[in-house]
């Protein structure tokens, strides 16, 4: 059994011994961290409700009871280039090689909602990802790939709702119901305004489009991950490692706050 009185005395002795050494290091006022933590810091801690067991709510120890041994993480290489037909061939090769999911890279015109024949698209079509202009392109992209067997991640933000609608339409053509689909859309528009710049609409309507996507997926595509909040892009745009985390969490909180004021809050 833990002897809290003994720990208190031991902690006091420790702090007295290292006080002079610790004084050499400046403390950051915004953080009230301690130099050492003990069971005293979790005295009265409700293990079941705050930590829980692996695979059980609140999932602080993983969503699978036996971690990756129960279910391996999805293996997916970020891929997409040139035309939908060429990328489709690449996807089939990756799946045959053992990949267990798809990660779709879109070209810049697609990311900002431009057709490949638009004047602003000149020189960028198919360069950093696949060009998707229409439902026909999406059909070619996933031709021969059973969407009820493979999960798909699409790194797309501004037109995320449109690309998701196309994906659902292709699945329905395959006879796959929306509720059978599994995957992710990045759908993190706020980091586009502050880091990457591939946005289409002003912030307010863009945020509304995101919460509408949340609501639709909660009712029609329950296995779909409706957002993947990005931090890496913010760091690459010049943020420090601390700012990277801070801004990403601030963005996530903004989505949650807006969600609570929408019709999708209950879901």
Task: Give short role names for the model-derived ranges.
Residues 99, 121-259:
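Active-site cavity-forming subdomains of large catalytic enzyme subunits
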Residues 260-267:
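Conserved small/polar residues in nucleotide/adenosyl-binding loops
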Residues 1-136, 141-148, 173-174:
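Acidic/polar, glycine-rich intrinsically disordered N-terminal extensions of enzymes
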């Amino acid at each position: 059994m833990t002897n809290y009185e003994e720990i208190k005395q031991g902690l006091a002795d420790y702090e007295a011994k290292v006080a002079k050494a610790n004084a050499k290091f400046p403390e950051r006022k915004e953080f009230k961290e301690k130099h050492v933590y003990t069971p005293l810091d979790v005295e009265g801690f409700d293990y079941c409700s705050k930590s829980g067991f692996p695979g059980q709510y609140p999932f602080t120890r993983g969503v699978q009871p036996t971690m990756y041994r129960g279910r391996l993480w999805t293996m997916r290489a970020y891929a997409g280039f040139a035309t939908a037909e060429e990328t489709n061939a690449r996807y089939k090769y990756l799946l045959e090689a053992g990949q267990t999911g798809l990660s779709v890279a879109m070209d810049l015109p697609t990311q900002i909602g431009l057709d490949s024949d638009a004047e602003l698209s000149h020189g960028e079509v198919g360069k950093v990802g696949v060009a998707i202009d229409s439902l026909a392109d999406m059909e070619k992209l996933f031709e021969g790939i059973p969407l009820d067997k493979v999960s798909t991640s699409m790194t797309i933000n501004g037109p995320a709702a449109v690309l998701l609608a196309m994906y659902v339409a292709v699945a329905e053509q395959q006879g796959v119901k929306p509720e059978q689909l599994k995957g992710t859309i990045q759908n993190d528009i706020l980091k586009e305004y502050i880091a990457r710049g591939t946005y289409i609409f002003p912030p307010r309507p863009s945020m509304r489009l995101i919460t509408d996507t949340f609501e639709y997926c909660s009712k029609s595509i329950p296995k779909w991950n409706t957002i993947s909040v990005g931090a890496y892009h913010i760091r690459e745009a010049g943020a420090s490692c601390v700012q990277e985390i801070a801004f990403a969490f601030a963005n996530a909180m903004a989505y949650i706050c807006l969600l609570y004021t929408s019709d999708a809050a209950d879901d």
